[in-house]
Regions:
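Bacterial N-terminal signal peptides that target proteins for export
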Residues: 1-10
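Bacterial signal peptide processing site
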Residues: 22-25
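Short, low-hydrophobicity acidic/polar segments
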Residues: 56-150
């Protein structure tokens, strides 16, 4: 009779030990329900002699961050879904609202024409990408920055004695875009740009 009680007690102990085993779920990141991004800006397509901007901005969903180094990392977590990643740099005479960049207006001296925009905005670069976020993932992204402002140089060479008689040249360029939606590459209405000319005196 005592031997039978001993066997039953051992069986109860084994049952308790087996019921205490728990299976843990393993995750790949510390944020199993969200995704996280890191954005590296690639400025290699900029024009010769143009410096890398000192600061640049990253926007995605309701997140906005500013960066001064090569890669932007943030603790912000994104719920699963589709987002538009927009990257751009602050530039003189250009404002950005969402993904629409607008050049500051200027005054012109030709009546009956379209509006004038500033003729010397800062160097402006942009990048956009559709990003699909899944939970429990990190996303290293590269933004290949596109240069949106270019420099135009025109040289007027008078012939004969015209060079000595010219005191001023007044000109403007038509058809310039005053706004740009850089997510869709859609340009706004045509505007005018005043072209400033400086007299160059060659000394032979």
């Amino acid at each position: 009779m005592k031997a039978r009680q001993y066997i039953n007690m051992m069986g109860m102990a084994a049952a308790v030990l087996l019921s205490s085993c728990v299976k843990d779920t393993l995750y790949d990141t510390p944020h199993p329900d969200y995704g996280k991004i890191a954005v590296t800006a690639d400025w290699s397509a900029r024009g010769e002699g143009i410096d890398i901007p000192a600061t640049w901005t990253v926007t995605m969903g309701d997140y906005t961050g500013t960066e001064t180094s090569a890669t932007h990392t943030s603790d912000h977590l994104f719920a699963p879904g589709s987002y538009t990643l927009a990257v751009w740099n602050p530039a003189e005479e250009i404002t950005v609202n969402g993904t629409t960049a607008t050049i500051a207006t200027a005054t012109g001296n030709r009546a009956g024409t379209d509006a004038f925009v500033n003729n010397a905005p800062g160097w402006f670069f942009t990048y956009t990408e559709q990003v699909s976020i899944e939970k429990d993932k990190d996303y290293p992204l590269t933004a290949a920055m596109k240069q949106q402002v270019r420099e135009l140089t025109l040289v007027v060479e008078p012939t004969g004695d015209a060079a000595g008689r010219i005191t001023e040249i007044v000109a403007h360029l038509t058809g310039a875009a005053g706004t740009l939606d850089f997510a869709t590459d859609t340009y706004g209405a045509a505007s005018n740009v005043v072209l400033p000319f400086t007299k160059i005196t060659e000394i032979g």
